[in-house]
Curated annotation (Swiss-Prot):
The PRC barrel domain binds ribosomal protein uS19. The gene is rimM. The lineage of its organism: Bacteria, Bacillati, Bacillota, Clostridia, Eubacteriales. This is Ribosome maturation factor RimM. Keywords: Chaperone, Cytoplasm, Ribosome biogenesis, rRNA processing. An accessory protein needed during the final step in the assembly of 30S ribosomal subunit, possibly for assembly of the head region. Essential for efficient processing of 16S rRNA. May be needed both before and after RbfA during the maturation of 16S rRNA. It has affinity for free ribosomal 30S subunits but not for 70S ribosomes. Signal peptide: none annotated. Its main location: cytoplasm. GO terms for cellular component: cytoplasm; ribosome. It is found in: Cytoplasm. One of its GO terms (biological process) is rRNA processing.
Length: 164
C-alpha cells in the first residue's frame, strides 16, 4: 500500500501572497481545516491557513510566499501520510489502493486491472482495462471480494450481470 495519499491538486494561485487554490480529491472538503501538514513532491510543509470555497479550498502553505512561487506549484498533488488519513468504514477503500488491483471473476478468469474509479453518485464504478475495457459497478451484488493486501478484486462472472 502507498505511504502517501493524494488529498488535493493545486489548480491555481489565489491572491498575491502565495496562497494556492486546491481542487479536493477527497469526499470531505472540511478535512482540510484539520490538516496541519501536506507533502508536495515528498517534502512536508505546514498549512498556515485554510479557506473553504464551494468547490475548492484556498491554502496558505509554508514556504510559498508570492504569486510567482505559488505559480510553480500548479498541477502538483498535495499528499498526506496514510496514518493521518481518515478512518474508513468497513467495506470502504481508498481509490489509490484500488487502482492497479487485478480483477478476476469467481471462476478465476482474468478480467484486467482497475485503471480508474468513477464517482456516479449512487455507487462507484471501476474502470477495468484488460483485453477490452469493462465498467464494473461497485456494488455487493457484483463485487464479491476486495483483497487490498493482495491487490485482487473478485467479481461475479460477466455473463451473469453484463448485457451484450
Amino acid at each position: 500500500m502507498k505511504e502517501f495519499l493524494a488529498v488535493g491538486e493545486i489548480i491555481n494561485t489565489h491572491g498575491i501572497k502565495g496562497e494556492v487554490k486546491v481542487y479536493p480529491l477527497t469526499d470531505d472538503m472540511k478535512r482540510f481545516k484539520k490538516l496541519k501538514e501536506v507533502f508536495i513532491d515528498g517534502e512536508g510543509r505546514k498549512i498556515l491557513s485554510c479557506k473553504l470555497q464551494p468547490n475548492n479550498v484556498v491554502l496558505k502553505i509554508e514556504g510559498i510566499d508570492s504569486i510567482e512561487e505559488a505559480n510553480k506549484y500548479r498541477k502538483k498533488l498535495l499528499e498526506i501520510k496514510r496514518e493521518n488519513s481518515v478512518k474508513l468504514p468497513k467495506g470502504s477503500y481508498f481509490i489509490a489502493d484500488l487502482i492497479e488491483c487485478r480483477v478476476i471473476d469467481e471462476n478465476g478468469r482474468e478480467i484486467g486491472q482497475i485503471s480508474d474509479v468513477i464517482k456516479t453518485g449512487s455507487n462507484d464504478v471501476y474502470e477495468v482495462k484488460g483485453k477490452s475495457e469493462v465498467l464494473v459497478p461497485a456494488i455487493k451484488d457484483i463485487v464479491t471480494n476486495i483483497d487490498i493486501e493482495n491487490k485482487t478484486v473478485t467479481i461475479k462472472p460477466l455473463e451473469i450481470w453484463q448485457c451484450e
